[in-house]
Amino acid sequence: MNLIAILEQEEIARLTGGNAVTEFAPGDTVVVSVNVVEGTRKRVQAFEGVVIAKRNRGLNSSFIVRKISSGEAVERTFQLYSPQIAGIEVKRRGDVRRAKLYYLRSRSGKSARIKEKLVLKKAKSA
């Protein structure tokens, strides 16, 4: 491994504090908890939406979350290892066939729905 990759791995370990980052994929509905500082007050703001893209670039990894708020579409890009992100919770797994779901931008209503991925449980052998 080269020196830059080693430094990136150390920085990722420092930022995550040893905790693993929640696994999610495009199509999943997630709730991103963001630390917001307003003057001297600090609070946590939740942003819930569908992950339409994920960019895996080590320390520079990011993802885009899209939601419909009051009839208006809102997209927000988050850095995966940002200290402003308090947590990521997966609400629902989506079953999609694409890595980038940019086509959802031109769709609304029922045509913008994503099927839910059903996880099969293994049967116990008796």
Swiss-Prot record:
Q: Which GO terms describe its biological process?
A: translation
This protein's name: Large ribosomal subunit protein bL19
Single GO molecular function:
structural constituent of ribosome
Q: Which keywords are on file for this protein?
A: Ribonucleoprotein, Ribosomal protein
> Could you list the residue ranges that cross the membrane?
none
Its annotated function is as follows: This protein is located at the 30S-50S ribosomal subunit interface and may play a role in the structure and function of the aminoacyl-tRNA binding site.
Which Gene Ontology terms of cellular component type are present? Answer: cytosolic large ribosomal subunit
| InterPro entries noted in UniProt | Ribosomal_bL19 (IPR001857), Ribosomal_bL19_CS (IPR018257), Ribosomal_bL19_sf (IPR038657), Translation_prot_SH3-like_sf (IPR008991)
NADP as UniProt keyword = no
UniProt organism field: Bordetella pertussis (strain Tohama I / ATCC BAA-589 / NCTC 13251)
What family is this protein classified in?
Answer: Belongs to the bacterial ribosomal protein bL19 family.
Keyword Ribosomal protein listed: yes
